[in-house]
Amino acid sequence: MNTDIANQLRAAKKATTDLNLIQSDTRTIILETLAANLEKHIENIIQENQKDLSLMLEQDPRYDRLLLNKERILSLANDVRKVASLPNPLGVSLLEKSMPNGLSIKKITVPLGVIAVIYESRPNVTIDIFSLCFKSGNVCILKGGKEAHFTNSYLLLLIKNTLKNFNINTDIVCLLPPERALMTQLLNATGLVDLCIPRGSQNLINFVRDNAKIPVIETGAGIVHTYFDKSGDLGKGKKIINNAKTRRVSVCNALDTLIIHADRLKDLPELVETLSQKHVIIYADQDAYHVLDKNYPEQLLIKAKPQDFGHEFLDYKLAIKTVPNIKAAIGHIQQFSSHHSEAIIAEDESAIDQFLIEVDAAAVYANASTAFTDGGEFGLGAEIGISTQKVHARGPMGLEALTSYKWVIRGTGQIRD
């Protein structure tokens, strides 16, 4: 292992003791101070962010993820304040029992320990991760992508300067070099890192899962579907589809495939009408293409190929699949879903119930946009990632997901027969 990396990880592990001694009220004050520092240094953050942006083409789908402007920085500071205001997740009693032999048993929440998060071109994640880890008593190891190196480095400087002002050990957070070659060393750091959370492309997540010797929670990749049922309301459908697809195309909760009941194909041109205003390219199956031909801009309409389904576009692109019934819609989702977010637009309550019960995803929606799959929108303050697995945590991971528990047993001298 690279000596510098090994030393950083050892220092981080050692710092867990110092972090656990910080009182909850102090952690809250420090996070509020960090939020104020973000607002105070908006121009400096934008200046560093521009250095990163200058190395990327504006047409790159990652450009929007990388961009930090005044509005986004203010929102980021507000998210930190929301996390600061949340109840302390540590020391919460999950279970209390008094046993017949006189033993008192409690199950209480504790930090996970050292959490490593590997992410790509979203520098706001740097602040989200630190605020959630700090509030929940976890040391965090940050490994951002090279695309955001200047921005991440400056944000880390703000974090460390804030900690120094409170005489807090700054080893509780570190930013590893962006070189991908160092990732294997991190993934092999058994005994030093308690959990790794990859956030980014499916390739990144697959690499981490396949090469890690430390525990991993898979997050991020979202192949998202919305099914417009036979009973769907056209007005609701237009708004939901437009929002889910075009609000922010570069995020994991953005719509990738619209599934439509064959009986409602006549309404398809109106359903996707607003998408043409955002120049959304549609990859339509044969039935959908026949209906949209001459009803959607020719240069934006393409006949779908098999590989267009089950694809996370992260761009102004949408696949459309026609199905004869809800069973086929659910079957298509089961085949291609990444188990992130799936939605149905319907007025038939039995169809809604069937969809919500049978579709296997971290978040399932009825008559709402999948854009809501977000820690802030779920009232979690922020999120460290959106888990697409079932073990330990699922969906947006807030403070509660960053804790484990331990059993505390008090006795008066009892021994077991």
UniProtKB/Swiss-Prot annotation:
Its main location: cytoplasm. GO terms for biological process: L-proline biosynthetic process. Pathway: Amino-acid biosynthesis; L-proline biosynthesis; L-glutamate 5-semialdehyde from L-glutamate: step 2/2. Keywords: Amino-acid biosynthesis, Cytoplasm, NADP, Oxidoreductase, Proline biosynthesis. PROSITE patterns: PROA. It is found in: Cytoplasm. One of its GO terms (molecular function) is NADP binding. InterPro entries: Ald_DH/histidinol_DH, Ald_DH_C, Ald_DH_N, G-glutamylP_reductase_CS, Glu-5-SA_DH, GPR_dom. The keyword Amino-acid biosynthesis applies. HAMAP family: ProA. Belongs to the gamma-glutamyl phosphate reductase family. Catalyzes the NADPH-dependent reduction of L-glutamate 5-phosphate into L-glutamate 5-semialdehyde and phosphate. The product spontaneously undergoes cyclization to form 1-pyrroline-5-carboxylate. This is Gamma-glutamyl phosphate reductase.
